[in-house]
A protein has these predicted regions:
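Generic structural signal for individual residues within well-ordered alpha-helical segments
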Residues: 7-8, 173, 210
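ATP-dependent adenylation/nucleotidyltransferase module used to activate substrates
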Residues: 1-150
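Catalytic subdomain that performs nucleotidyl-dependent activation
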Residues: 113, 135-200
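Hydrophobic alpha-helical segments, chiefly the membrane-spanning helices
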Residues: 212-215
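Conserved small/polar residues in nucleotide/adenosyl-binding loops
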Residues: 201-208
Length: 215
């Protein structure tokens, strides 16, 4: 892979797409993971308004720290980048309490709640996208999202554009290094951020949920 050529191609594609859509820029959900770090760094390079949202829902401290540090880093490097923290934990907990059912009768409850987290974040991204005239920019890659379908319908799969949809996971790691994404993010164990120890089930890794290995 010609790394710099790929970076330039995606950056120009993003810019052209936004101009064609008459959008002012991009909004990206930043989780502290490798995919969102790469997408946000690519969006930042366009020079267009780039809003980075951190949307914790019972998130682990290390995930929050990585996301915040990544946003701060891009803000220091690019004048067009702004960051916002929207703590969705209270909203999610109120929703979970409102729709609560007996898990013995509804064994899919925990999975449904996990997917609800992703859908709540999607709603938040589109809210901020619409009031700011920004495109909701997806972080799905060729293998997980557009290969095996490892995403939440109308959740993280609900986006306007998907700039890394054609990239394999190994290629994303290569781009991350070239884009100066922090080593803490590049070395972090992949997670979808939809499960936690507050739920009955232990947090499954993407590998556990898909039955396949990450690079």
């Amino acid at each position: 892979m010609q790394t710099q050529a790929v970076i330039e191609h995606i950056t120009q594609w993003l810019k052209s797409y936004a101009e064609g859509a008459r959008a002012k820029g991009f909004v990206v959900g930043v989780s502290g993971g490798i995919d969102s770090a790469v997408v946000s760094a690519l969006a930042a390079r366009t020079g267009l308004n780039t809003l980075l949202l951190e949307m914790p829902i019972r998130q682990k401290a290390d995930q929050i720290d990585r996301a915040q540090l990544h946003i701060e880093n891009l803000q220091q490097r690019f004048a067009n980048v702004s960051g916002l923290r929207v703590d969705l934990t209270p909203t999610f907990e109120q929703f979970a309490a409102t729709v609560d059912v007996n898990e013995a009768d509804f064994p899919a409850k925990q999975l449904a709640l996990a997917n609800a987290r992703s859908r709540l974040r999607m709603v938040t991204l589109y809210y901020y996208g619409q009031i700011n005239g920004l495109l909701v920019t997806g972080t799905g890659n060729k293998v997980e999202d557009f290969g095996v379908g490892f995403f939440t319908k109308y959740g993280d799969g609900g986006v306007d554009i998907s700039p890394i949809a054609g990239l394999l996971k190994t290629q994303i790691y290569t781009l991350a290094e070239a884009l100066d994404v922090s080593e803490s993010i590049r070395q972090a164990t992949p997670t979808d951020g939809l499960w936690d120890t507050c739920l009955l089930y232990p947090s499954p890794s993407p590998r556990d949920q898909r039955g396949s290995r990450m690079p």
